[in-house]
């Protein structure tokens, strides 16, 4: 079987590429891609990846040089995401593949080693938990501000007559 005849050959690089003989239709690809939603997870994906890289280094699964390269690359990626200059691609489907690809562009093989001992499901679960925690913290702060505003308003109107509310 020639390379082009193998299932998934025309979709190389996709997580699902071994299952299909033909590339996905562009409409299906856009429908399946989660990049537009995932962009809000980028900083959490970076934080999770940095924690994972540090664990790999402590376990001696990657070298100190690899860890330094990953940290340097992730710092650059974080800056690109925050500035809006990160090169997002629908071809890479999600936040994880986009960041992993960019990291490998920046630091070479050290970026590929970051995937050691971690599944994409682990990444998704971690990113979502970190994002949700940040959202809860933000909502808690907003609720606290509303509560303080209501308390302040109530203290200013302790003598206000409210006959309709008996």
Which residues make up each language-model segment?
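A helix-coil-helix interface module used to build multimeric assemblies
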Residues: 2-166
């Amino acid at each position: 079987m020639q390379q082009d005849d193998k299932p998934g050959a025309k979709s190389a690089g996709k997580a699902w590429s071994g299952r299909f003989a033909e590339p996905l239709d562009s409409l299906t690809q856009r429908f399946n891609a989660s990049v537009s939603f995932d962009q809000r997870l980028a900083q959490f994906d970076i934080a999770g990846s940095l924690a994972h890289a540090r664990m790999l280094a402590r376990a001696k699964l990657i070298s100190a040089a690899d860890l330094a390269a990953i940290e340097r690359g992730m710092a650059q990626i974080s800056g690109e995401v925050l500035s809006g200059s990160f090169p997002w691609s629908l071809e890479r489907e999600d936040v994880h593949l986009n960041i992993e690809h960019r990291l490998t562009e920046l630091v070479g093989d050290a970026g590929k080693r970051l995937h050691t001992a971690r599944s994409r499901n682990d990444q998704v679960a971690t990113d979502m938990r970190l994002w949700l925690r940040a959202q809860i913290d933000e909502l808690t702060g907003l609720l606290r501000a509303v509560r303080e505003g209501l308390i302040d308003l109530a203290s200013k109107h302790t003598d206000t007559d409210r006959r309709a509310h008996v």
